[in-house]
Amino acid sequence: KVRTDAAGAPLKDGDRVAGAFAYDRDTGEFILFKAKAVVLATGGIGRAFLVTSNSWEYTGDGHALAYHAGAELVDMEFVQFHPTGMMWPPSVRGILVTEGVRGEGGILKNSEGKRFMFDDIPPLYQGSTADTPEEGWRYVIGDREARRPPELLTRDHVARKIVKEVKEGRGSPHGGAFLDIAWVKEKIKDSEAHIKKKLPSMYHQFKELAGIDITKEPMEVGPTTHYVMGGIKVDGDTQMCTTVPGLFAAGECGGGLHGANRLGGNSLSDLLVFGKRA
């Protein structure tokens, strides 16, 4: 197995890709691969943004390589932002804060302590969104007659609401909002044990990386670049064949499968199915 960084474009013989040229990070050597097909599985473009949940290698290299080889890119304007990424300290900025926090009753507040998500519920979702905090809490604890709290609206809407609060001067100290799960002590007798049981990874993540005890104080969160729906144009049937013979794309670097706004969890089935096919 050779760990490489892509260097230059895939090699072509006429109109067809016939191999690739790479750089071995461990030895410093250049390597020439001759192949009947090249499969790009380079992930997304998250690291092109200042704040992202993506790994360090998600720099869009595959997109650039495919483009220079003559492939088409599609839907690159469709970028998904997860509304809750860590905001502080700088070393953890962008790391994902699971939607499970809001699912267990976490609420979003601005610097004035106001729960702002009730202020602007899109008409499309008004019929399925709680009118009051009381109804929202009933939904959290399993009341089937209650509607969901506004913190559980779509990712794009929640992200825009946080950005709006920041732009209007009501953001948290480091450019986000406060996500508070500790408030459930008003509803649950032994809230500290409850939070640790329901959200163990989040408890340890904030305790170890940010020095925050989420059972006692709010988390500082903000939008983080999470996924790009666009990418290298692939065939609609196989979701792998690009517009260049011999060049294939699998996973997030391929575009079009998820439309304009990917549904949560679908990227996992995407990469498993088309990664296996590749």
Describe each region flagged by the PLM.
Residues 1-29, 41, 85-89, 94, ...:
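Conserved redox-cofactor binding core of oxidoreductases
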